[in-house]
């Protein structure tokens, strides 16, 4: 397979199967990552879940894969909190061509917001005290398994720093990455030293921010540095990265 369209009928049938199997609370998206990243969605079912349509952009995780920061980008059964308060149970599978290059990805976002709330309700409703001798008769067989499958109930909490963000255009994704870099820095841009600004740029580079068209202009504006200075930072970062790669190979 060279492109997604070489097997387009199969992808369409697979998406239809998933759509009918999981119903309207499950969003299924097919991305063509050979396109402009601002318009990667080539098919989407139940797009109301993340408010996206055909022609919208991919998430920040796809940028990391294209940048090469993440070698094996497949992720299964992880939790994402959307900006409008939804809790999603998500999986992402990247699609490669015959040469092993990433050309697309298939994503599933199952809205579990209401079931998580119902789970919390049941915990409160079933609150009780039991004698230790009778504990085995009512507690789960594997407490560890039950705890491992518990999803945090506070959908208003801030997403973790490596969270996935769903957006209608790539500018929103870039702004999200800049905001995450700000959080990591922990201080206003005006107070950042040269070394801290380099780390700021290093983070954005690892996240694939510079794959976004005209991202350099926005990042220069945010850091209050010239384009010349920004490119000097990038040159330094990538030289260090290449040196580390060569050292690891020798070892």
Which residues make up each language-model segment?
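DNA major-groove recognition helix of helix-turn-helix
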Residues: 234
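Short, Lys/Arg-enriched anionic-surface-contact patches
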Residues: 178-204
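Juxtadomain coupling helices with adjacent low-complexity linkers
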Residues: 1-8, 21, 110-187
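Short alpha-helical "recognition helix" segments of helix-turn-helix
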Residues: 215-223
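Sensory/regulatory domains in signal-transduction proteins
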Residues: 61, 65-124
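Residues in the helix-turn-helix
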Residues: 229
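Structured interaction and signal-relay segments at domain junctions
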Residues: 16-77, 81-83
């Amino acid at each position: 397979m060279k492109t997604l369209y070489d097997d387009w009928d199969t992808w369409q049938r697979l998406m239809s199967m998933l759509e009918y199997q999981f119903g309207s609370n499950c969003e299924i998206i097919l991305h063509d990552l050979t396109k402009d990243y601002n318009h990667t969605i080539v098919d989407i079912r139940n797009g109301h879940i993340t408010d996206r349509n055909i022609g919208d952009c991919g998430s920040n995780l796809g940028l990391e894969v294209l940048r090469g920061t993440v070698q094996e980008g497949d992720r299964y059964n992880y939790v994402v909190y959307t900006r409008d308060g939804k809790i999603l149970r998500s999986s992402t599978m990247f699609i490669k061509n015959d040469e092993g290059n990433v050309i697309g990805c298939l994503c599933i976002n199952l809205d579990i917001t209401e079931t998580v709330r119902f789970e919390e309700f049941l915990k409160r409703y079933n609150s009780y005290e039991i004698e230790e001798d009778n504990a085995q008769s009512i507690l789960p067989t594997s407490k560890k398994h039950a705890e491992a499958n518990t999803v945090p109930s506070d959908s208003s909490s801030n997403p973790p720093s490596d969270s996935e963000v769903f957006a209608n255009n790539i500018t929103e994704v870039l702004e999200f990455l800049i905001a995450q870099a700000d959080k990591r820095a922990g201080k206003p841009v005006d107070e950042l030293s040269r070394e801290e600004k380099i780390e700021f740029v290093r983070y954005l580079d690892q996240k694939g921010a510079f794959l976004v068209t005209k991202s350099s202009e926005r990042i220069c504006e945010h850091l209050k540095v010239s384009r010349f200075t920004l490119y000097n930072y990038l040159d330094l970062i990538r030289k260090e990265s290449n040196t580390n790669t060569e050292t690891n190979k020798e070892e």
